[in-house]
Amino acid sequence: MARVKTGVVRRRRHKKVLKLARGFYSGRRKHFRKAKEQLERSLVYAYRDRRRKKRDFRRLWIVRINAACRLNDISYSKFINGLKKAGIELDRKILADLAMNDAAAFAKIADAAKKAL
């Protein structure tokens, strides 16, 4: 029985890893072992940050809404409470967009929240 060498399989495996490592810096792009180690780390970071991105954007939206609320003489927590009592169901993403791009509309919503309190 002939001896099976890993030539083709190894080359395919190395090419796959090195293709995914494009854009990495220096030897982490060119050397298989370093590229493989960095790729494993990169995939861990990507997995973690796909979950973290949701939290980060929510925090950003809250900061923007809070800043706009302060301009309209109401705190963020009272604003959100007023929205719930007024029956206004806008999520934080939409509210943050209004706060940044349409201050007049946000002011009307803030007034409605104040009246509901």
Curated annotation (Swiss-Prot):
One of its GO terms (molecular function) is structural constituent of ribosome. Disulfide bonds: none annotated. It holds the Pfam family Ribosomal_L20. It comes from the Bacteria. Keywords: Ribonucleoprotein, Ribosomal protein, RNA-binding, rRNA-binding. GO terms for cellular component: ribonucleoprotein complex; ribosome. One of its GO terms (biological process) is translation. PROSITE patterns: RIBOSOMAL_L20. HAMAP family: Ribosomal_bL20. Belongs to the bacterial ribosomal protein bL20 family. Binds directly to 23S ribosomal RNA and is necessary for the in vitro assembly process of the 50S ribosomal subunit. It is not involved in the protein synthesizing functions of that subunit. This is Large ribosomal subunit protein bL20.
